């Protein structure tokens, strides 16, 4: 019973990877559209996009760390 609940917790925490992937894809697409409309601002747009994606990726990294901790600490 307890191992099953741990497995469910690991699965739920890894669902955040799906959200992060979708969010980063949308951000990259919108950045490409913005550069297409205003090529002179490409460096500012790229910098802002990379900072935003780094912040979003940190959530996925935290979820991965939590999943690994659940997997090895409680088994």
UniProtKB/Swiss-Prot annotation:
Keywords: ATP synthesis, Cell membrane, CF(0), Hydrogen ion transport, Ion transport, Lipid-binding, Membrane, Transmembrane, Transmembrane helix, Transport. It is a multi-pass membrane protein. GO terms for molecular function: lipid binding; proton-transporting ATP synthase activity, rotational mechanism. Its main location: membrane. InterPro entries: ATP_synth_csu_bac/chlpt (IPR005953), ATP_synth_F0_csu (IPR000454), ATP_synth_F0_csu_DDCD_BS (IPR020537), ATPase_proteolipid_c-like_dom (IPR002379), F/V-ATP_Csub_sf (IPR035921). It is found in: Cell membrane. F(1)F(0) ATP synthase produces ATP from ADP in the presence of a proton or sodium gradient. F-type ATPases consist of two structural domains, F(1) containing the extramembraneous catalytic core and F(0) containing the membrane proton channel, linked together by a central stalk and a peripheral stalk. During catalysis, ATP synthesis in the catalytic domain of F(1) is coupled via a rotary mechanism of the central stalk subunits to proton translocation. Key component of the F(0) channel; it plays a direct role in translocation across the membrane. A homomeric c-ring of between 10-14 subunits forms the central stalk rotor element with the F(1) delta and epsilon subunits. Belongs to the ATPase C chain family. F-type ATPases have 2 components, F(1) - the catalytic core - and F(0) - the membrane proton channel. F(1) has five subunits: alpha(3), beta(3), gamma(1), delta(1), epsilon(1). F(0) has three main subunits: a(1), b(2) and c(10-14). The alpha and beta chains form an alternating ring which encloses part of the gamma chain. F(1) is attached to F(0) by a central stalk formed by the gamma and epsilon chains, while a peripheral stalk is formed by the delta and b chains. This is ATP synthase subunit c. The lineage of its organism: Bacteria, Bacillati, Mycoplasmatota, Mycoplasmoidales, Metamycoplasmataceae. The gene is atpE.
């Amino acid at each position: 019973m307890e191992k099953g609940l741990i497995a469910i917790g690991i699965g739920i925490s890894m669902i955040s990877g799906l959200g992060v992937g979708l969010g980063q894809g949308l951000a990259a697409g919108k950045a490409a559209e913005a550069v297409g409309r205003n090529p002179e601002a490409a460096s500012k747009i790229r910098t802002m996009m990379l900072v935003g994606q780094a912040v979003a990726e940190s959530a996925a990294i935290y979820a991965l760390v939590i999943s690994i901790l659940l997997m090895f600490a409680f088994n």
